[in-house]
C-alpha cells in the first residue's frame, strides 16, 4: 500500500482524467476486436475470493510481428551474439530470479539456467510463496528474498509468462505440490486494487502498475473483467486501464507540449524520468490493455500518440547521453549502459505499438527505427570496448546495480532488436 503522488490525485477511477492537448491525439478507425482461443464461459458480475477458482484465464490467439522488419545487416548478428552470451550466462543465475525472468523475456519460456535446468520451473519452485485470501490460498512472488530481487516490479513474473506465450494451464512445482500459471493470475487479480478517495493503491506507486495491467489484459477471459479485490474494492479492468493511461499522459504532457512547440524538452527531474526505463513499461502495459479492447476510445488515442512522442524523444535523449559522456568522462560506462537501456526499450516499445495496431510507420519513421537499431549496435560495441561484457564478475564486485543493468538491459535489447528485425513475434 502506498500513497499516491499528488500530481495525479485528480484522476478518479471510472472518470477518465481529461487529457488536454487533444489535437495531439491522432484520429483512427475503430480498433480491431482481439481474438481469443475459444469462447469464454459466461462470467459472474464480479470475481472474488469466493468464486475465483472458476475463473479460467485465456491466452490470446492472435500472434503478430512487425509488418516491415528492419533490413538485416551482419552487424545485428554480431551485436545479438554478444548480448546473447551475457543473457545465457548471467541471466541464468539460479540465485537471481529477476534475471531469470529477463532471460525468459529474451529467449522465451524454454530459457534454461546456466546449469541446464528449466528457468521457469526453478523460479516457481524456489521463489513462489503461498498467498492467502481469507480461507483461499493461491501463490505470489515476494519483492525480494535475502536482499535478492525477485519481483521489484509487481507482477513481473506473470507479465513475462503471458507475453512469451506460456499456457495459463501450465503447471509448476511449488512447495510439496504444483500450481498453475492461472493460479498466479487469480492471485494477481485479487490483490490489485485502487482507492482514489483515500489516495491509496495496492502498488508501490504509479510506476509499479504496468506489469500487472499488461498481464491481466493479456489473459483476460472476456471483454469485461470485474472483481472484488482483497480489500473489498470493486475493480474493473476498463477503469484500471483508463487510470494507467491517464497517469502516463499526464506525466508525458511536458514532452507533448515541447513537441507541439517545435522545441526540445529538458530533463529537469520530471517524474517520468524516475519511472522504470523512462516510462517504457508504462507505455507497453497500457498498449496491451487498449489493444486488447479495454479502456475508453480516448485511452486508445492517448496510447497511440505515444508512438509519435517516442520518435520525437529518440534524437533528443541520445544527444543528452552523448553530451553527458563528453562532459563527465568518469561516468562514461554507466552512461553507455543507460544508452543501451534506452535504445533496447525504445525498439521494444515501438515494435509492440506497431504489432498491437497502434502505430503504422511511414518510410521516414521506418528509417528512424532503422537508425535506432544501428545505434544499438554502436552502443553494444562501445560497451564491449570498455571491457564490461568481458568482466562481468569484476563489474559486479564494483557496482551491483551496473551489473544488474547490463544483464537486464541486454535482455531487453535482444527482445527489442529481434522484434524490430521480425525475428520475434508477439501474442496479444
Give the location of each predicted region.
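Hydrophobic membrane-insertion alpha-helices, especially the h-region
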Residues: 2-15
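Preference for long, amphipathic alpha-helical scaffolds in soluble/luminal domains
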Residues: 13-428
Amino acid at each position: 500500500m502506498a500513497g499516491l503522488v499528488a500530481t495525479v490525485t485528480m484522476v478518479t477511477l471510472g472518470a477518465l482524467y481529461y487529457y488536454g492537448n487533444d489535437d495531439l491525439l491522432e484520429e483512427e478507425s475503430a480498433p480491431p476486436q482481439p481474438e481469443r482461443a475459444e469462447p469464454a464461459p459466461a462470467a459472474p458480475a464480479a470475481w472474488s475470493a469466493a468464486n475465483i477458482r472458476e475463473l479460467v484465464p485465456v491466452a490470446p490467439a492472435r500472434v503478430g510481428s512487425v509488418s516491415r522488419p528492419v533490413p538485416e545487416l551482419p552487424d545485428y548478428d554480431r551485436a545479438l551474439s554478444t548480448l546473447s552470451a551475457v543473457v545465457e550466462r548471467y541471466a541464468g543465475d539460479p540465485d537471481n530470479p529477476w534475471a531469470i525472468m529477463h532471460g525468459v523475456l529474451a529467449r522465451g519460456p524454454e530459457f534454461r539456467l546456466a546449469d541446464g535446468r528449466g528457468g521457469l520451473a526453478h523460479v516457481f519452485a524456489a521463489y513462489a510463496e503461498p498467498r492467502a485470501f481469507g480461507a483461499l490460498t493461491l501463490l505470489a512472488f515476494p519483492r525480494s528474498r535475502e536482499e535478492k530481487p525477485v519481483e521489484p516490479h509487481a507482477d513481473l513474473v506473470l507479465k513475462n509468462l503471458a507475453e512469451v506465450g506460456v499456457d495459463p494451464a501450465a503447471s509448476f512445482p511449488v512447495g510439496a505440490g504444483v500450481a498453475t500459471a492461472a493460479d498466479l493470475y487469480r492471485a494477481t487479480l485479487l490483490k490489485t486494487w485502487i482507492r482514489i478517495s483515500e489516495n491509496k493503491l495496492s502498488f508501490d506507486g504509479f510506476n509499479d502498475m504496468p506489469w500487472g495491467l499488461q498481464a491481466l489484459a493479456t489473459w483476460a477471459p472476456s471483454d469485461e473483467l470485474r472483481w472484488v479485490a482483497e480489500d473489498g474494492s470493486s475493480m474493473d479492468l476498463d477503469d484500471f486501464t483508463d487510470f494507467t493511461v491517464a497517469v502516463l499522459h499526464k506525466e508525458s504532457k511536458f514532452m507533448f507540449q515541447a513537441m507541439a512547440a517545435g522545441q526540445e524538452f529538458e530533463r529537469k527531474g520530471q517524474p517520468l524520468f524516475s519511472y522504470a526505463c523512462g516510462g517504457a513499461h508504462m507505455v507497453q502495459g497500457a498498449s496491451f490493455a487498449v489493444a486488447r479492447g479495454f479502456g475508453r476510445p480516448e485511452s486508445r488515442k492517448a496510447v497511440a500518440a505515444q508512438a509519435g512522442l517516442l520518435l520525437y524523444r529518440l534524437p533528443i535523449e541520445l544527444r543528452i547521453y552523448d553530451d553527458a559522456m563528453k562532459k563527465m568522462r568518469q561516468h562514461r560506462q554507466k552512461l553507455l549502459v543507460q544508452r543501451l537501456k534506452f535504445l533496447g526499450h525504445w525498439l521494444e516499445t515501438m515494435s509492440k505499438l506497431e504489432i498491437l495496431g497502434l502505430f503504422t510507420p511511414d518510410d521516414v519513421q521506418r528509417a528512424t527505427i532503422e537508425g535506432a537499431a544501428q545505434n544499438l549496435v554502436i552502443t553494444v560495441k562501445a560497451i564491449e570496448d570498455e571491457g564490461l561484457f568481458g568482466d562481468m564478475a569484476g563489474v559486479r564486485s564494483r557496482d551491483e546495480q551496473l551489473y544488474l543493468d547490463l544483464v537486464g538491459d541486454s535482455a531487453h535489447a535482444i527482445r527489442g532488436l529481434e522484434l524490430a528485425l521480425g525475428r520475434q513475434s508477439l501474442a496479444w
